């Protein structure tokens, strides 16, 4: 009689035993309490400010506990992939000095002992764990076509019941091993589904590091774990990767909160210890009185490239994001104006449960303070750097370094340094009266009106005396 093992061998004849990977990726040798975090974006476009926020928090927690922060690329959905997106992610993190200890360091290469760090290069690893689940009777081949699945959904909608592939609707769950083997040998195409042991009428209690106690119904969906192309789905890949890379804390946006029951179930059925989860509230925008998530489509400031274009220093953006992360940071910064942000202790359980509003005025205010602490030389280097990319005219006049340093040196480096620059794109406007070539150009644009009729002069003098003149 054919059994699960025969089925597993037919589907994945070349897959290794999972013990091979368990030995290849041993526990990390880290001090007690060390936190291992990751930033795991998909290479589908630019880095969103929310992604930067998550990485900043993940990097900080790893640093302050002598742990590890790594960059993993989740590229199993190859239809959505954008060319050179990985190097874009790597350089965005570099620009903000949020550098991973291991993981991807360019478009195709990674560093560290727990790689590959690109999911598309880990296909054989996922297949080994999928094979293991099939051997245990915890996963099965599903022969339903996309049309079959659509038909199931239509029936569920008509009957007004919960959509999905579960319970009586999971048609292939009950296909016998013999039948499955025959159908595969006949060349029928299939995917691999997880056989969920869950029941929707049972509750699970989960402790989220940020949100506290959360109750969910158990997962009962038989989700796809390996697609027709042999690559895993996000859910399955993340469970295998976070286990083998020994992630201790998964820090991610709270749009993933509803996946927790499924993820915990996958960890449990695979025999893994689950990581802790910390679900971060999104950064919101006030859109005419309505709070909504910052959106890649509608908001320029959602893309991290926006800050470089505007000339807002990376340091200022990080200070501002740390303010959003922990409200205690503001007082800490006031008490320690000259300390590095690295000395601040971030606490996950002090993070806000609801989304913070993105406040550009506040960010520019933080930025003014950051720039006010720079030396004339640093202001000059930064302004020139920015101008050479975004404003040729400014770059041209800054070529006279000696004069520029005098201009930037005015009221700088004393107890109350000037706070007139909030971003490098402000510089030209702030210094134009110090440069003939800029001032002359503006003089044509704003001609000075000469007033010489007696009536107007009397009117102005009278106004001055009433409003401003004080004999004392």
Question: Where in the sequence are the language-model features?
Answer:
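Structured loops at beta-to-helix junctions and adjacent beta-edge loops in soluble globular domains
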Residues: 40, 143, 195-197, 228, ...
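Acidic, glycine-rich active-site loops and adjacent beta-strand->loop/helix elements
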Residues: 73-79, 254-256, 281-284, 363
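Second-shell loop/turn segments in exported
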Residues: 76-78, 117, 250-252, 304-307
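N-terminal Rossmann-like or analogous alpha/beta NTP/dinucleotide-binding catalytic cores
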Residues: 2-158, 258-272, 316
């Amino acid at each position: 009689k054919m059994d699960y093992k025969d089925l597993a061998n037919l589907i994945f004849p070349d897959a290794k035993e999972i013990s091979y990977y368990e030995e290849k990726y041993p526990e990390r040798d880290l001090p007690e309490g060390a936190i291992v975090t990751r930033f795991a974006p998909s290479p589908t476009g630019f880095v969103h400010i929310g992604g930067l926020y998550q990485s900043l928090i993940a990097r900080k927690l790893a640093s302050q506990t002598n742990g590890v922060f790594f960059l993993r690329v989740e590229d199993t959905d190859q239809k959505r992939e954008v060319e050179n997106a990985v190097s874009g992610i790597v350089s965005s993190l570099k620009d903000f000095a949020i550098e991973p200890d291991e993981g991807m360091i360019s478009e195709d290469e990674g560093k560290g002992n727990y790689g590959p760090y690109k999911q598309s290069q880990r296909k054989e690893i996922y297949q080994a764990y999928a094979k293991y689940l099939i051997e245990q009777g915890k996963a099965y081949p599903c022969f339903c076509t996309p049309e079959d699945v659509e038909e199931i959904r239509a029936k569920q909608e008509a009957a007004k019941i919960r959509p999905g592939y579960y319970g009586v609707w999971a048609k292939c769950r009950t296909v016998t091993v013999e039948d499955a083997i025959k159908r595969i040998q006949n060349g029928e195409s299939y995917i691999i589904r997880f056989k969920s042991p869950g029941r929707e009428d049972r509750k699970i209690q989960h402790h989220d590091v940020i949100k506290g106690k959360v109750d969910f119904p158990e997962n009962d969906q038989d989700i796809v774990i390996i697609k027709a192309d042999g690559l895993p789905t996000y859910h399955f890949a993340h469970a295998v990767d976070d286990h083998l890379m020994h992630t201790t804390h998964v820090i991610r946006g709270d749009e993933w909160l509803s996946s927790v029951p499924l993820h915990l179930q996958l960890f449990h059925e695979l025999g893994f210890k689950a990581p802790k989860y910390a679900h971060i509230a999104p950064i919101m925008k006030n859109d005419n009185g309505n709070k909504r998530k910052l959106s890649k489509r509608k908001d320029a400031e959602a893309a991290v490239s926006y800050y470089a274009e505007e000339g807002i220093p990376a340091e200022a953006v990080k200070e501002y994001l740390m303010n959003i992360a922990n409200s205690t940071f503001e007082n800490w910064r006031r008490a320690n104006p000259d300390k590095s942000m690295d000395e601040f202790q971030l606490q996950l359980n002090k993070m806000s449960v609801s989304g913070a509003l993105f406040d550009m005025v506040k960010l520019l205010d933080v930025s003014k303070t950051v720039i006010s602490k720079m030396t004339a030389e640093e202001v000059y280097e930064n302004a020139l750097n920015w101008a050479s990319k975004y404003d040729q005219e400014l770059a041209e006049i800054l070529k006279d370094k000696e004069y520029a340093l005098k201009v930037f040196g005015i009221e700088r480096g004393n107890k109350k340094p000037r706070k007139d620059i909030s971003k490098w794109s402000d510089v030209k406007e702030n210094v134009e009266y110090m440069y003939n070539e800029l001032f002359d150009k503006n003089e044509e644009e704003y001609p000075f009106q000469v007033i010489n009729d007696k009536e107007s002069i009397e009117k102005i003098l009278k106004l001055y005396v009433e409003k401003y003149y004080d004999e004392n």
